[in-house]
């Protein structure tokens, strides 16, 4: 019996035929489909309806064997380590050719497409393979004619050197190692596949066996097993189509898509419940907003006021007291929560006597403003204010400067002189429409405002001590001093509001006659917000500076004076700091 020659492409075709998903039970809604060499086969009739004559029995047996052996595909994923190299040639696989077929391939003539074969001495006792399912039927003829020459088909990969060296030396005993060559572990798929392929040999292969025994005649049966299967199917009434679009079953695809969609979709919660949950979430947020609007009204109003007054926005906290036009309900809520203990004490005990500190004589006027019941009159009271407002967060205090012209006195009371009589003080406040009580500022014995109350001006960033502070003996502004400044002004504005509410807006002293909300102009508010002009101005460009030393340096830009000259390069500079920086260049050059 002659076996058909097998090579790599023919085996891949058989594997594609076996591993095709189209080898399934026949469907009632679609025709039977099979895959052959990358193309699908459309069977015009069901397999059960085909005639069962002797011509079709062989092809049906082939199909049944392929269908029944489909379960061996699962063994592909069960790969194990290589066994020891002792007698398991069935697991040999080189470039797609299984090892347990090397003995059967040795009995065949090489295919026309495969010109890579070699002559090797091969003993007949090595043809027995306990694991191979293929029968070597031509062994007796080959032994009687030529026992040392057989055609062995090799792959593109060279065989091991032990086999090649044994073949070149002519030693027959060394060729037995071919049965022990194992490169890759393979499954039972190849054995079953080739047993099916060997059963497809045509009837004329008997004469080819004799030619194979001589080792010189060409193979009569040149068709591969896959071609024989195709011919058998064609003779049984099977038509082969090339167009793959005719075999797409959209119904099955839709069913698979529906199954996948139902598996992916989250069906744990019904859609109606999801909608209810969304509504509950929205309602809960709406309830929270309503609760915030009802219980945090003062915080909202405070934010609005801060947005209107940009300069005070950096110094007013969300829980700080509000300006004069705040509602009385907000004031009561602040008092009830204990935010303003001093104001609450003042409202409960009443204002102090205005004549207690000022009196009627001019000798006592240095202790405070005469007739101003709201001004702080003692150091202990200032300490009390500092203790009450130490928890506020304000920027560090800085030195404040004012303008030289007398009109600036009504904006910033720092340079207000201590009045010698009440008439002069009243005229001064009536001219400017400004009151010390409204601003919440107090004067000291020399007429200068306390530095405790002058830390809320944004433009004052200098750290030097001015002459006015030197005269008053006040120390440099500290952080604690600025912390109590912001709330102190706000508290005294609340006191002014309460006084106007209790007294009906009636003035109690000659100075109070000038106090009214309409008496504040834009310039007055700018002074309160810290936008007053600097003290010293340039006589040429009218630019203001905080101290005179800055003006001297500034005047050099107009006059072109450069009194500081470098000793090395004779380059002149307006400021000494620039000269020192320039000298560093010469020092670096000298080191280099």
Curated annotation (Swiss-Prot):
- Renumbered zinc finger spans (C2H2-type): 536-558, 564-586
- Locations listed in the record: Nucleus
A GO cellular component annotation here is: nucleus
Residue ranges with Gly residues bias: 356-369
Q: What happens when the gene is disrupted?
A: Embryonic lethal. RNAi-mediated knockdown in the trachea of first instar larvae results in discontinuous tubes. RNAi-mediated knockdown in the tracheal terminal cells of first instar larva results in lumen devoid of taenidiae and occluded with disorganized electron-dense material, pan-tracheal liquid clearance defect as well as a breaks in the dorsal trunks.
Q: What does this protein do?
A: Transcriptional activator. In tracheal terminal cells, regulates the transcription of factors involved in the formation of a mature apical extracellular matrix (aECM) which is essential for the integrity and shape of seamless tubes.
Protein name stated in the entry: Ichor
Species in which this protein is naturally found: Drosophila melanogaster (Fruit fly)
